[in-house]
Regions:
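Domain-edge interaction signal
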Residues: 1-173
């Protein structure tokens, strides 16, 4: 049970802090799609790929006292900040998590805004389609986000960049 929880904790530890539930969902999904060992099931929802399993794991880690969740009122909505507690850090020190190196990848993902990660994860969700078909899906399913063709192209370049970071980290290890 705790293996998948520990992987999630390792991501948050590597990031230092993750601001936003949606952002954390997208970071894990993108990491999964670039062959990092995450196994949560994802379905397509309003904000792109979403995993109920991941939401439950986060809740469990908060309940166990391993993850600190801060609710902040920002404008007309609540925003959540996630970081490891001291107990979570202690747990990670004593739990041998089999993970490829991921710090550079996670730090880069964490630097991106949620809107862009939503686009990247949506592009990855439809990775079996041709680029033109993916573009049409984005324009249809994400019409309210008003993504441009340039942003979609940027998402493809970013996916290549993240895959490269993962490969570099594996070679360094």
């Amino acid at each position: 049970m705790m293996k998948e929880h520990a992987k999630l904790m390792k991501v948050i530890f590597s990031a230092g802090e993750v601001v936003g539930r949606k952002k954390l969902q997208k970071m894990i999904y993108i990491a999964k799609k670039v062959n990092l060992p995450f196994y949560e099931k994802y379905n397509f929802h309003f904000y792109g790929p979403y995993s109920e399993e991941l939401t439950l794991r986060i809740e469990e880690l908060c309940n166990l006292g391993f993850l600190h969740e801060v609710h902040e009122k920002k404008g007309g909505y609540f925003q959540y900040r996630y970081s490891l507690t001291d107990a979570g850090s202690d747990f990670l020190r004593h739990y041998d998590v089999e993970m490829p190196p991921l710090k550079d990848c996670i730090l880069d993902l964490n630097e991106q805004n949620s809107r862009f990660l939503e686009l990247v994860s949506t592009v990855l969700f439809f990775d079996g389609l041709q680029q033109e078909e993916v573009k049409e899906k984005v324009f249809t399913l994400k019409s309210k986000q008003r993504y441009t063709e340039e942003e979609i192209l940027e998402a493809y370049h970013y996916i290549d960049k993240i895959k490269g970071l993962v490969t570099e980290e594996l070679v360094k290890d």
